[in-house]
Structures are given as C-alpha cells and as structure tokens.
C-alpha cells in the first residue's frame, strides 16, 4: 500500500523557490507519540523520500505501534524536459517537497519499546538527506 503524498488541489500549481532561513517555530514538539525524529538541518524533503522512510519504519516495527508523519509535501518543484533550450517559460511540476527547517519533528512513534523505536528511526533517517536525532517525551530539547 503506497501512499502518494501530494496535495489533492492547489490554488497555484507552480510555486517559487523561496528561502529557507531560521529554525522551525511550529511542529517542534511531540504532539502524538512518545518517540520522534527531529530534523537538525534545513532541506526540501521529497514525497518519495518521506515514503521510503515510512516503509523503513513500518518494516521494522511489523504492525506494532502507531506512526504519525508530521510533514507534508505541499510545495511543487518544476523541471524542464531534457535537451530543452533555455527560456520559453517555467517548466511543469515534476515532484512535491516538504520544506523542513531545523527543529521540525518529522515522524512520531508510539506503542513500542524505546530500543525498537530508536532502531526504526535510525533506519528511516538513512533514507533522508538531512541529519536527524531521536527524541523522547522525557528528553525533549530545543534546537
């Protein structure tokens, strides 16, 4: 069961790149689970990377526990067809990304022993292009 993470409808199909300054101010604390994965760097995380991390976690926990994905790819990234000359307007949306700033909680887990949750998050972190850290409700520290 693959989850295609992309918005159902958007007001504007093509978005500007924007700048990724500062740290996350929202989504920085555990809201659902007892364990979480927190971003330590800023990046665009694609829908396929989020899905790969989700699959890695679910394979390790084997139907036990509950997983929450706290980021959603709502920004389109456009690309031009190969071997196309410059100009002639902006390309078509190629994929979707979630803008992640340092301090943002990416995934949360509950209903598992801490060691299992930690190993699951380690496997998922290998699928992501940023450094992350494992946090628990007891040891929640600010970035």
Curated annotation (Swiss-Prot):
User: Which PROSITE patterns does the record associate with it?
Assistant: RIBOSOMAL_L16_1, RIBOSOMAL_L16_2
Q: What Pfam families does the annotation carry? A: Ribosomal_L16 (PF00252)
Q: Supply one GO BP term.
A: translation
The cellular component terms of Gene Ontology attached to this UniProt record, alphabetical and capped at eight, are: cytosolic large ribosomal subunit
tRNA-binding: present as a keyword of the record?
Answer: yes
Q: Which GO terms describe its molecular function?
A: rRNA binding; structural constituent of ribosome; tRNA binding
Nucleotide-binding: is it a keyword of this entry? Answer: no
The source's superkingdom equals Bacteria
* Basic residues composition bias: residue spans: 8-20
Q: Which Gene3D superfamilies match?
A: Ribosomal protein L10e/L16 (3.90.1170.10)
What keywords sit in the KW lines?
A: Ribonucleoprotein, Ribosomal protein, RNA-binding, rRNA-binding, tRNA-binding
Q: Where is this region: Disordered?
A: 1-26
Protein family: Belongs to the universal ribosomal protein uL16 family.
Subunit info here reads:
Part of the 50S ribosomal subunit.
The task this protein performs is described as: Binds 23S rRNA and is also seen to make contacts with the A and possibly P site tRNAs.
Name the chain's protein.
Large ribosomal subunit protein uL16
């Amino acid at each position: 069961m693959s989850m295609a993470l992309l918005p159902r409808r958007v007001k504007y199909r093509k978005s500007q790149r924007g700048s990724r300054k500062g740290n996350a101010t929202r989504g920085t604390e555990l809201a659902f689970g007892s364990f979480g994965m927190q971003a330590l760097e800023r990046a665009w995380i694609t829908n396929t990377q989020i899905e790969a991390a989700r699959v890695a976690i679910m394979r390790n926990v084997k139907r036990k526990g509950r997983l929450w994905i706290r980021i959603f790819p709502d920004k389109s990234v456009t690309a031009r067809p190969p071997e196309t000359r410059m100009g002639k307007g902006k390309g078509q949306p190629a994929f979707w990304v979630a803008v992640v700033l340092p301090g943002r909680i990416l995934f949360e887990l509950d209903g598992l022993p801490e060691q299992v949750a930690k190993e699951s998050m380690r496997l998922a972190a290998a699928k992501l292009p940023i450094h992350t850290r494992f946090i628990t409700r007891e040891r929640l520290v600010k970035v």
